[in-house]
Regions:
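A well-structured
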Residues: 1-177
């Protein structure tokens, strides 16, 4: 399947939050490592679907920053991305503190738990508004860079097309660029 043929559907944050809460609760209440591992497999499929939707929207926005639909989708994910990160972190904490951790480490590896430990140290829900602001500013910057129009030598170029002048063997042309 070609990238352009991949169907895009915006995630429903209410459904996403409900599913994260369900997975977290079921993981907490699991009666065995096997049960937690099966829930973990569901978690991986669920997060893969969420991430696919997010990535499709972001890539399509990067391809054409003037597309209003994907600009709105990008803005949406700038807002909800940190909230999703919070749920992923909550799930990670439950997994990390699992009484069945030895079994889980044998199934999914110790590196996963080291990554969870690092993520736990790096994330605090107090920074969600800052993460949202950072996402919005990064998107705005990317759009400015992508839509820059630079008059040069009687033509108008974007930044990527200016590269050929900036790397020209002609020193005077490089200086002007």
């Amino acid at each position: 399947m070609k990238f352009s043929e991949m169907p895009y559907k915006r995630i429903d944050m209410e459904e996403v939050e409900k599913e994260y809460k369900s997975i977290i609760e079921r993981t907490k209440n699991a009666k065995s490592g096997e049960e937690q591992f099966e829930i973990h497999r569901e978690y991986y499929k669920f997060t893969a679907d969420v991430q696919t939707s997010m990535e499709l929207a972001m890539i399509r926005h990067d391809i054409d920053t003037t597309d209003e639909f994907y600009e709105k989708e990008s803005d949406f994910y700038d807002e909800v991305g940190p909230i999703i990160s919070q749920y992923e972190n909550e799930y990670g904490k439950v997994l990390y503190d699992s009484p069945y951790r030895d079994y889980l480490e044998s199934k999914i590896g110790k590196v996963t738990f080291k990554n969870i430990e690092i993520a736990n140290k790096a994330f605090d829900e107090k920074i969600i508004p800052l993460m949202q602001e950072e996402n919005a500013l990064s998107s705005r910057y990317s759009k400015l860079i992508a839509t820059a129009k630079i008059p040069f030598e009687g033509e108008v170029y974007n930044l990527s097309l200016m590269r050929k002048f900036q790397t020209s063997p002609d020193r005077e042309l490089r200086r002007k660029a």
